Amino acid sequence: MAKDFQDIQQLSSEENDHPFHQGEGPGTRRLNPRRGNPFLKGPPPAQPLAQRLCSMVCFSLLALSFNILLLVVICVTGSQSEGHGGAQLQAELRSLKEAFSNFSSSTLTEVQAISTHGGSVGDKITSLGAKLEKQQQDLKADHDALLFHLKHFPVDLRFVACQMELLHSNGSQRTCCPVNWVEHQGSCYWFSHSGKAWAEAEKYCQLENAHLVVINSWEEQKFIVQHTNPFNTWIGLTDSDGSWKWVDGTDYRHNYKNWAVTQPDNWHGHELGGSEDCVEVQPDGRWNDDFCLQVYRWVCEKRRNATGEVA
């Protein structure tokens, strides 16, 4: 170690006695590379070795002292935390746990209450919806009944007026159609809801002081179809004796006609025996001659007059 220290002192003496560090030498001028030549730049001259070693030792001692001080502070702080702050922290933690537990319980209770309330509201809505639907159905039924009465009100009013007049005349005058008969342009019509052969239908009408309907105009034709569609219906036209005739004697040749295309054809292909001598109105209103034993609905007609007899 002593030898190394002497070597270091010798190196320092040599550096101080170097001729290039003594200002200007004999016959020469001291050149400073960093000053004399601006184009030459290099690192600054190195510090003495002893100074560098001293700086390193001081830095190490300072770092060691700081670490020891930091360790002491940590130990003291930890000890205080374990003694006082730790207990307070534990208390605060327990308080937070309790508050969270209470919050969870209250929230769960509120959710259950909302769910129960929502279920009851849903039941009420369902019940109200059912009641509303029933009320709508009742209103629709009342509306339909009202429309029905309004539709038949004029007929009912005429019937009441007719009955009043009949009572005032002590039965001597009858100016309205019988019950279940429909009045149209001075005639009374009865529409069947079952079927008969043509001859049986005509006989039924005669028992009512009427006959199978005789169609005299397009207006009457339209009225008949409105009440018979979609059924095939017998009318009072036949050619059983070889020529077409209306049952009330109306002239066939000059009266209204509404035959379907190619009709009458007296077709025999029905394989029922006999010819087609009776007329039925089809659902589209066109006339067709048919086998008289076919079973169709029918319409009776009679004129309305003061005595109620068939005109």
UniProtKB/Swiss-Prot annotation:
SMART domains: CLECT (SM00034). The modification Phosphoserine is found at S13. Pfam families: Lectin_C, Lectin_N. Disulfide bonds join C177-C188, C205-C300, C278-C292. A motif (Endocytosis signal) lies at residues 5-8. It comes from the Eukaryota. One of its GO terms (cellular component) is plasma membrane. Keywords: Calcium, Disulfide bond, Endocytosis, Glycoprotein, Host-virus interaction, Lectin, Lipoprotein, Membrane, Palmitate, Phosphoprotein, Receptor, Signal-anchor, Transmembrane, Transmembrane helix. Residues 80-311 are extracellular. The keyword Metal-binding does not apply. Glycans are attached at N102, N170, N305. It is found in: Membrane. GO terms for molecular function: asialoglycoprotein receptor activity; D-mannose binding; fucose binding; pattern recognition receptor activity. PROSITE patterns: C_TYPE_LECTIN_1 (PS00615), C_TYPE_LECTIN_2 (PS50041). A lipid is attached at C54 (S-palmitoyl cysteine). InterPro entries: C-type_lectin-like, C-type_lectin-like/link_sf, C-type_lectin/snaclec_domain, C-type_lectin_CS, CD209-like_CTLD, CTDL_fold. It is a single-pass type II membrane protein. Residues 1-58 are cytoplasmic. Signal peptide: none annotated. Expressed exclusively in hepatic parenchymal cells. Residues 176-302 form the C-type lectin domain. The functioning ligand-binding unit of this receptor is thought to be at least a dimer. Interacts with LASS2. Mediates the endocytosis of plasma glycoproteins to which the terminal sialic acid residue on their complex carbohydrate moieties has been removed. The receptor recognizes terminal galactose and N-acetylgalactosamine units. After ligand binding to the receptor, the resulting complex is internalized and transported to a sorting organelle, where receptor and ligand are disassociated. The receptor then returns to the cell membrane surface. PANTHER family: MANNOSE, PHOSPHOLIPASE, LECTIN RECEPTOR RELATED (PTHR22803). Calcium is required for ligand binding. This is Asialoglycoprotein receptor 2. It comes from Homo sapiens. The lineage of its organism: Eukaryota, Metazoa, Chordata, Craniata, Vertebrata. The gene is ASGR2.
